UniProtKB/Swiss-Prot annotation:
Primary role: DNA primase is the polymerase that synthesizes small RNA primers for the Okazaki fragments made during discontinuous DNA replication.
Gene Ontology CC terms: alpha DNA polymerase:primase complex; nuclear envelope
Binding-site residues for [4Fe-4S] cluster, renumbered to this chain: 315, 398, 415, 457
Cofactor note: Binds 1 [4Fe-4S] cluster.
GO biological process: one example: double-strand break repair
Name under which the protein is recorded: Probable DNA primase large subunit
Amino acid sequence: MLRSNVSRIDPKRRNVLDHRKKQFAEAAYKDTDYPHRLNFYSTPPTADITIEQFEQWAIDRLRILAELEACSFRNKTPAETASHMKPLLDKYLPLDTNSSSSSQLFAQRQKDHYSHFILRLAFASTEDLRRRFTRVETMLFRMRLNADDGRERAAFINSLNLDWETVSDEEKRELAAELAATASFGGYKKGQQQQQQYEEDQQTWCKVSWLRVPELVEQRRVFLRQGYAYVPAREQQAMVVSEFSSRLERQLELTARALPRLDEDDRLTPILAHLSKNFITPDASYVGTSSAISSADISARNIDTLVNNHHFPACMSHLHRTLRRDAHLKHYGRLQYTLFLKGIGLNLEECLLFWRQSFNKITDDTFNKEYRYNVRHTYGDVGGDSNRRGGGYSPYSCQKILTEHPPGPGEAHGCPYRHFNMENLQTLLQQGMGVTDRGVLNGVKEDKEKQKFHMACNRVFEHLHKEELKKAKDEGIMTAAQLETIVHPNEYFKRSYLLKNMGKMQGDVKMEG
């Protein structure tokens, strides 16, 4: 009989290994070079960086993305956005061209590379974060692509190995008339720049399946033949941006599926959680009562007066009037309105008094059992340590109101400019806010149809405060920066209150820019 070898591994137990360690046991570490200013972020970085770099680089990129999102909310044009973002990019996320011969090229591109992937980890967890991250990263990529040197841009696009086929000179000669007609349909105006663009189009055409460029087909900006779309140079940048966006969407989904299996460093988890929670626009970061006006009298007894003086935006005016009519609001309506009142400076004691007086069809016992705790929780008076330390919840921004928890039957929360039909919206504006000017109402209708809900709200604000705005501009009380598009209900209140009380509170009106 043969003796068994006691040192031999039991075959049944041979593969019982930690799958996480096995998964990453043979990671391929390699140095990354950055031949191009732009990046499709196809390859994750593998070199070591410090925990301080990890956090600071992510925060710097987050500043850029948040400000880009704010520009889109204010409906700035691409040129206005580029002008606004240039000093911020130079400060937080500079990217010099190869022709600049800067000694900082590698460091700049490494920071850009790493910061993208750090935020990708932070924002892959939910569909909403993935969608927002893709949108603002695409905005950043488009802006950089448009600003890139022509030769460097062409070299970068060629390096991507996109599934394009360059149209040969022979084929261009064969289709010269059709391609010329397509180019002229795009609309060239006289001028040196337009002539250069026309000549460039004549030199560089590519063809792809028409299914990849349905927007260009719809706009008749390409020539179609045998299932292929012939795309001129001026439209190829749009195709690159579209490819960047679609790839990033797919990669974020893969990242989301991998998150539960990642053996993350315990030091990184709280950083990633903090980054995702703070992915908000600078104008939307109202924490606690930071939007409150110190000298304003905000109490339960004068909320009706503030509403009647048109200091509340349409969303909050509708919630208030619904509350007064029904003596009740459903959960999301109570939450949205409570946080707004908290943000304008209504303290917890007064807020509890306001809700108790408003819910006048129920007993004290019912109110204390069903509603009192929730109000205290939003103020950070009860709940876990983190809730109390953080002062409870922050007031909702326009973006949050527009994108989260759309109202259902019997609910009054949300944004009237988005969630109301036009008839109900006009009734609210006319009867609830005193907007009767036909031109303003028609403008609101056009804004709503174009889904420019922020513009509709600001149009109403400017109409209701036109005299005060003129005085503030004429006397230099507020700068242009302080009068930019409102993207937060609490900013609406603050600006309205200060404008209506300019003569009484000059100190408060001089807001920080």
